[in-house]
Every structure is written in structure tokens, then in C-alpha cells.
């Protein structure tokens, strides 16, 4: 957000959010900041990451075991939860289920909602328009609905965006049931780590924000 960018420009100590927190905050922060959903709402998040997200220990484990897929953090106390709760102004930790699959980098973070979770009566079109308007001036963030998402082979893949600072926020919906999934697709090593650090550095020292990205 513009508020965070301005804070970064004058800060002496800057930390880049964890990759799961990055995806979660990009979805939840606008909803709570603008009052679309109460900060007392019990958010539910599911995510999948490439195995590089676990650092050298998980990379070594995966190279030795070649596990196709696994969940972890099943004590519901993942280390990124305080970041999400603090920056999104939540009263409660989200229910968060992270997972790892057998690919090196890339990730998807999914937020599950219904149309009834919103504070005021709204439509799917208004939700899509809200996110598009909110991020319209953020060149690294693109918002799509499932009416115009082009899915390779018809599948939504977590390793579509790699070696990049880009994020796609995708909105999948069922107008009959009133259910929707708001999803962030990005590179856990890019926007979720090093590329975000470069963007912060550029902002802090007055460089072109996209320099090196």
C-alpha cells in the first residue's frame, strides 16, 4: 500500500515479510483496512509452496525423499501468523494450513470466503472491482477473475510465476453458492523473499522502484 511504501522510505530497520505472510497480507489487508470484512472475522487460509521455501533443511529432505506432497504446521501456530495478524489488524490468528509439494519454487495462497462474510451486501463484481481498483497503481500486482484467467492445460499451478516480483491475485467464484476463493500466485523466492527485499531497498534509497526487478 502507499502507506507502507511511505513508511519504508523513512525507516531505518526494514524486514521483508515471510512468503506466506506476503500472500496472505496482499489479500486480507485491503479487506480489513477498507472495512469490507470485520477484523474479528475468522479467516481461513490454505497454501502450497515449492520446497525451497523451507530453506536448506527442507531442500535436503526433499532431495533425499522426493515426497510428492505434505502438510505441516498442524499445531496451527505457524511462525508467519503473527505477521498476518499484526499487519492486517486482526483480532484472531487465521486458521492456516501450509503445505509443500514436489517442485522447487512458486506458491499459491488461498483465502476462503462466502459473500455473507462481507460487512455490507455486495456482489462478486464489486469484490473484483474493489481489488482491481485497490491495486491499479501497483505495477507488480495483477488482479484477475476466473472469467478471464487463462489456465495452462486448464489447471491452476503454483509454479506459474517464478524468477519474478510479480503477484497475480485471482478471484474464483461460484455465483450460485455465494462462495469465493481469493488467491495469490507468486514466487516464494521472488516476491516472497529476495525480489521484495530489492523493492524495499529501492524505495528506501530513492531509486526507481523497479530497478533490478
Task: Walk through the language-model features, giving the residues of each.
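Helix N-cap/coil-helix junction residues
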Residues: 36-37, 90, 207
Amino acid at each position: 500500500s502507499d502507506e507502507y511504501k511511505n513508511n519504508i522510505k523513512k525507516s531505518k530497520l526494514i524486514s521483508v515479510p515471510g512468503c506466506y505472510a506476503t500472500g496472505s497480507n496482499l489479500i486480507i489487508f485491503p479487506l480489513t483496512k477498507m472495512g469490507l470484512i470485520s477484523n474479528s472475522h475468522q479467516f481461513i487460509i490454505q497454501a502450497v509452496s515449492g520446497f525451497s521455501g523451507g530453506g536448506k533443511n527442507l531442500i535436503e529432505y526433499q532431495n533425499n525423499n522426493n515426497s510428492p506432497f505434505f502438510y505441516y504446521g498442524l499445531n496451527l501456530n505457524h511462525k508467519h501468523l503473527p505477521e498476518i495478524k499484526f499487519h492486517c489488524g486482526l483480532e484472531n490468528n487465521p486458521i492456516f494450513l501450509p503445505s509443500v509439494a514436489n517442485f522447487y519454487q512458486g506458491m499459491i495462497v488461498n483465502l476462503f470466503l462466502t459473500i455473507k462474510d462481507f460487512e455490507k451486501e455486495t456482489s462478486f463484481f464489486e469484490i473484483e472491482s474493489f481489488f482491481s481498483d485497490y491495486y491499479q497503481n501497483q505495477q507488480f500486482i495483477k488482479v484477475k477473475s476466473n472469467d478471464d484467467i487463462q489456465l495452462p492445460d486448464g489447471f491452476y499451478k503454483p509454479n506459474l510465476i517464478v524468477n519474478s516480483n510479480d503477484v497475480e491475485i485471482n478471484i474464483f467464484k461460484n455465483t450460485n453458492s455465494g462462495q469465493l476463493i481469493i488467491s495469490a500466485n507468486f514466487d516464494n523466492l521472488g516476491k516472497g523473499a529476495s525480489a521484495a527485499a530489492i523493492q524495499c531497498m529501492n524505495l528506501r534509497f530513492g531509486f526507481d522502484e523497479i530497478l533490478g526487478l
